[in-house]
């Protein structure tokens, strides 16, 4: 490992001890914001420090094994230890490189998840419902909280569009690669000839950030329309104009919210989603300006970018970005997404490492 990397790891090891001491100070404990920030930093540094300590120990073990080579009785055992030690060091160095990659500050935050039916009519809306259920099950398995912000029901089930806020640790970092086009191939329940239909949905994932970090929105840039909500809701539905539609005139971004009975609550929810969308658009524009020719696994941000196909007759799901195919569609639709998500995350990290190597 390069001396510069070792020096950086030693500095992080010192910072880990420093943060540990700070977390025990009464003034820090009394300041909840600072305590939370330091706790997050400590958790990240703990992983790096633990891995670095294992690497240091492995290096010492290698030196001990090399000294044993001079002893004829111990030589065979020493050679075996050196072989195993070399493999362990290589694995630890790879892990340390990943841990040292620049962190997206949004990764630890929650997110807004939008699922929208595309081409395919009723079948697309039904599939949008299936996708939302899949993500909800995944969130449940991770102990994340899902709050529906807005939902427009499909005529025969599912959703024309559904927006949810997912809260928990590391939500955005896990789900941000889900943005893009999702295609389904299956035989609809209404299909009497047994023909396979192709439908599509789009998914957008945006980081949920504190209000203070959202872009400033000039009220004069907004057009706010009220209308009567539709869908489930008992007697209250269609009796008051509680639903809200907000249009951000400079960008043309439109957000609707009709989930709450209170117009005020619907407006607050719609504004939070609007702020996240505007921020996501600004970040995407900046990334495009900074982007090199290297492929971007986060996609172009264009909803038409097809990232995944779900083929029900074959029980197959394919991620087109990394040419990964799994024959576990039933498990995936029940929310077991790690087998799909982790390879994309790892590929993204490999791309980051390659980009850093080119810069050096």
Curated annotation (Swiss-Prot):
Residues 284-293 have a biased composition (Basic and acidic residues). Keywords: Cytoplasm, Methylation, Protein biosynthesis. GO terms for cellular component: cytoplasm. Residues 284-305 are annotated as: Disordered. Pfam families: PCRF, RF-1. The modification N5-methylglutamine is found at residue 235. Methylated by PrmC. Methylation increases the termination efficiency of RF1. The keyword Signal does not apply. It is found in: Cytoplasm. SUPFAM superfamilies: Release factor. GO terms for molecular function: translation release factor activity, codon specific. InterPro entries: PCRF, Pep_chain_release_fac_I, Pep_chain_release_fac_I_sf, Prokaryotic/Mito_RF, RF-1. Gene3D superfamilies: 3.30.160.20, 3.30.70.1660, 6.10.140.1950. Belongs to the prokaryotic/mitochondrial release factor family. Peptide chain release factor 1 directs the termination of translation in response to the peptide chain termination codons UAG and UAA. This is Peptide chain release factor 1.
């Amino acid at each position: 490992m390069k001396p510069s990397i070792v020096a950086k790891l030693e500095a992080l090891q010192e910072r880990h001890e420093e943060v540990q001491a700070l977390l025990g100070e009464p003034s820090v404990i009394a300041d909840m914001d600072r305590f939370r920030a330091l706790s997050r930093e400590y958790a990240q540094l703990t992983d790096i420090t633990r891995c670095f300590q294992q690497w240091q120990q492995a290096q010492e073990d290698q030196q001990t094994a090399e000294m044993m080579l001079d002893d004829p009785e111990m030589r065979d055992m020493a050679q075996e230890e050196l072989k195993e030690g070399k493999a362990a060091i290589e694995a630890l160095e790879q892990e340390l490189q990943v841990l040292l990659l620049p962190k997206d500050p949004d990764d630890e935050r929650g997110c807004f998840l939008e699922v929208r039916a595309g081409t395919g009519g009723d079948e697309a809306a039904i599939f949008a419902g299936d996708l939302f259920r899949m993500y909800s099950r995944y969130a449940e398995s991770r102990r994340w909280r899902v709050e529906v912000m807005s939902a427009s029901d499909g005529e025969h089930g599912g959703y024309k569009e559904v927006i949810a806020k997912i809260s928990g640790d590391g939500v955005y970092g896990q789900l941000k690669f889900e943005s893009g086009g999702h295609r389904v191939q299956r035989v609809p329940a209404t299909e009497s000839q047994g023909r396979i239909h192709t439908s599509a949905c789009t998914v957008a994932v945006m980081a949920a950030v504190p209000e203070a970090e959202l872009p400033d929105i000039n009220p004069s840039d907004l057009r706010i329309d009220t209308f009567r909500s539709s869908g489930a809701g008992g007697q209250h539905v269609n009796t008051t104009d509680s639903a809200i539609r907000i249009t951000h005139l400079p960008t043309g971004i439109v957000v609707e919210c009709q989930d709450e009975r209170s117009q005020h609550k619907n407006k607050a929810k719609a504004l939070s989603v609007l702020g996240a969308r505007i921020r996501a658009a600004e970040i995407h524009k900046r990334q495009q300006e900074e982007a090199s020719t290297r492929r971007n696994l986060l996609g172009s941000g264009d909803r038409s970018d097809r990232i995944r196909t779900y083929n029900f007759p074959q029980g197959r799901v394919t991620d087109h970005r990394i040419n990964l195919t799994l024959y576990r569609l039933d498990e995936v639709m029940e929310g077991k997404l790690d087998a799909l998500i982790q390879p994309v995350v790892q590929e993204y990290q490999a791309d980051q490492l390659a980009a850093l190597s080119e810069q050096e």
